[in-house]
Regions:
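Membrane-proximal intrinsically disordered regions of secretory-pathway and membrane-system proteins
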Residues: 1-166
Length: 166
């Protein structure tokens, strides 16, 4: 198995709360805006920071904190937790292990090389949207949804978590 520099996992809660389904609808719109800001602006920010800080950039905890909050919001929107900032869920685990020597050219190259990941995440996001609708209806009825659907959404967020620090 390949060792990824970013790992993500979260356990399925015993029950979900019904009001959070409606809050997630609003959260999905906010997430859409935040998502595009992360995809477009984070690589630019990383390139600027790498050009000015070099090796110190890898030790920067601020970016790791932003990524942790972003993945926490993904976890909430994708029906993985009832915590709005999913990183506050006790079963939430997101770790980033920086490595290599950062360069400006490398940051720009990763931006271009990440385009296939963005396309795959977009396709998986479409599937996750259908699962979100089914899962939301199931939560409204029984305060729970199928473990298989949870696992698919967790896999989508795991892919996002592996790409985001890239």
């Amino acid at each position: 198995m390949i060792a990824y520099p970013a790992t993500f996992d979260i356990a399925k809660p015993a029950r979900f709360t019904r009001p959070n389904v409606f809050i997630r609808i609003i959260g999905a719109f906010i997430f859409g805006i935040v998502n595009w800001l992360v995809v477009v602006l984070l690589p630019i920010y990383a390139a600027i920071q790498i050009s000015s800080q070099k090796e110190k950039y890898l030790q920067n905890e601020t970016v790791k904190g932003w990524l942790r909050s972003y993945i926490g919001l993904c976890s909430y929107v994708y029906l993985l937790t009832d915590e709005f900032d999913g990183s506050k869920d006790p079963t939430f685990r997101f770790d980033v292990t920086p490595g290599g020597t950062p360069t400006l050219g490398g940051a720009l190259l990763r931006y271009i090389m990440g385009i296939p990941h963005i396309l795959i995440i977009g396709a998986l996001g479409s599937v996750a949207s259908i699962i979100w609708i089914i899962g939301s209806i199931m939560i409204l009825i029984s305060e729970d949804y199928a473990a298989g659907l949870f696992d698919i959404n967790r896999g989508v967020v795991r892919w996002i978590a592996r790409y985001a620090p890239y």
